[in-house]
Amino acid sequence: MASTNQKVVIIDTGCANVSSVRFAIERLGYTVTISKETSVVLNADKLFLPGVGTASEAMKNLQERDLVELVKQVDKPLLGICLGMQLLGALSEEQGQNGKELVPCLHLCDAPIKKLKTGNLPLPHMGWNTITPIDNHPLFQGIPAGSYFYFVHSYAMPVSTGVNDYTIAQCEYGQPFSAAIQSGNYYGVQFHPERSSKAGSQLIKNFLEM
């Protein structure tokens, strides 16, 4: 079990409401720092990368705050949440209102970010849904099968197959998509664990105790 004295940092991207993530971590007994300073980020034991809005706006924010290369230098466990998970991918279809080209993201995970094809189901995918994690992954330890998590999104990473197997949990909403990923020390969840009741709290606890 990791110590609650470890350095926990939420990266200050300028494109996220970090309060709910901070409170969820503090409820578990940890002290949280919100920062974009190089020394603070690189000395952290665990990091969170939250995000809201569009991929194009978020990447612009990261560039303006000199965070793109900094995030790539992180060698400790980092958890991207919602848009923060998508930013870990390669190219996003979510360009914003005036964009026509794919948005280059951090490319820490070799995955595209595509608009969900939901048939008659409405977009965004908003509300509670179940996920199917891979067996015995530590991020989902102690979380009962069939647990619900809270989603708000219109874009997602496909479920991975083959050599670049990044999917560690999947969800179904008109089509299967990656609900959680791992690429080395970078983790991501498409749902909001900080808004997902006991299951979400357990997931955050698991991440902090890795």
Curated annotation (Swiss-Prot):
EC no.? 4.3.2.10, 3.5.1.2
Q: Which GO terms describe its molecular function?
A: glutaminase activity; imidazoleglycerol-phosphate synthase activity; lyase activity
Q: One GO cellular component term, please give it.
A: cytoplasm
What PROSITE patterns does its record include?
A: GATASE_TYPE_1
Coarsely, its chief localization is cytoplasm
Q: Does the keyword Membrane apply?
A: no
State the CDD domains in the record: GATase1_IGP_Synthase (cd01748)
- Domain Glutamine amidotransferase type-1, chain residue ranges per copy: 7-210
Active site residues according to the UniProt entry: 82, 192, 194
Q: Which reaction equation describes what this protein catalyses?
A: 5-[(5-phospho-1-deoxy-D-ribulos-1-ylimino)methylamino]-1-(5-phospho-beta-D-ribosyl)imidazole-4-carboxamide + L-glutamine = D-erythro-1-(imidazol-4-yl)glycerol 3-phosphate + 5-amino-1-(5-phospho-beta-D-ribosyl)imidazole-4-carboxamide + L-glutamate + H(+); L-glutamine + H2O = L-glutamate + NH4(+)
Q: In which pathway does it act?
A: Amino-acid biosynthesis; L-histidine biosynthesis; L-histidine from 5-phospho-alpha-D-ribose 1-diphosphate: step 5/9
Which keywords label this protein? Amino-acid biosynthesis, Cytoplasm, Glutamine amidotransferase, Histidine biosynthesis, Hydrolase, Lyase
Q: Name one GO biological process term.
A: L-histidine biosynthetic process
Localisation: Cytoplasm
Which residues span the membrane? none
Q: Do you know which InterPro entries this protein is assigned to?
A: Class_I_gatase-like, GATASE, Imidazole-glycPsynth_HisH
Keyword tRNA-binding applies: no
Q: Write down a Pfam family by its short name.
A: GATase
Q: Could you give the subunit structure recorded for this chain? A: Heterodimer of HisH and HisF.
What's this protein's name?
Imidazole glycerol phosphate synthase subunit HisH
